[in-house]
Amino acid sequence: MLIPLQLSAQSDEQLMLRAARGSDRAFEELYNRHARRLQGFFVRRLDDDADLAADFMHDTFLRLYAAREKYHEGNSFRAWLYTIAYNLCKNHHRNQLSIVHDDEKDMPTEADIEVELDTNILHDALREVLKSIPEPYAMLFSLHYEEELTIPQIAQITDLPEGTVKSRLYKTMNIIKQQLKQYENR
């Protein structure tokens, strides 16, 4: 007689397969593992709006739950989860663009330029820089360096070729380096 593994000992992919077969406990375990980090992802992508981030996090899991039967063995759970999250952010920012003109969005505001940052708090400086670069580039940076997704996973999530993901990450890093040097010189 085989004894099933404790849920906490199973991989995300194993849990998602169980959830696809109707196990609410397996889905709850996935939620417990990923909700906090996913909400942090949304907070960073939604200008520190914690309430909106919580709504987006819950919406992501609701969509994941509704589509759980479509999950196939061999797929990366995290890539699927962040595909949903990425698309929610992309749609949100697309809706925001109807309010703000593209050229205004791509340029940092005077307030962003004049913000005085303590050079000892690199994290805060980085977050400010990320707010001033175009959203698609900031999103790629966040997926790779903050959420620790691989280039192939990001390519799958964003529906971009791997080479494009790499070149945009390289360009983003150069922009970040240049802007952080400006903060250093203040």
Mark where each language-model region is.
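Short, charged helix-capping/linker segments at alpha-helix termini
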Residues: 2-6, 20-29, 39-59, 157, ...
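Internal acidic/polar
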Residues: 8-9, 91, 96-123, 150
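Sigma70-family region 2
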Residues: 20-21, 46-48, 58-76, 95-96
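Short helix-capping/turn signature of helix-turn-helix
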Residues: 33-36, 45-46, 142-149
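Residues within the DNA-recognition helix of helix-turn-helix
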Residues: 34, 168-175
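Arg/Lys-rich amphipathic alpha helix in sigma70-family domain 2
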Residues: 66-73, 83-103, 119, 171, ...
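Short, Lys/Arg-enriched C-terminal cap helix and immediately downstream tail that follows
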Residues: 94, 138, 173-186
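Helix-turn-helix DNA-binding module
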Residues: 128-139, 147-164
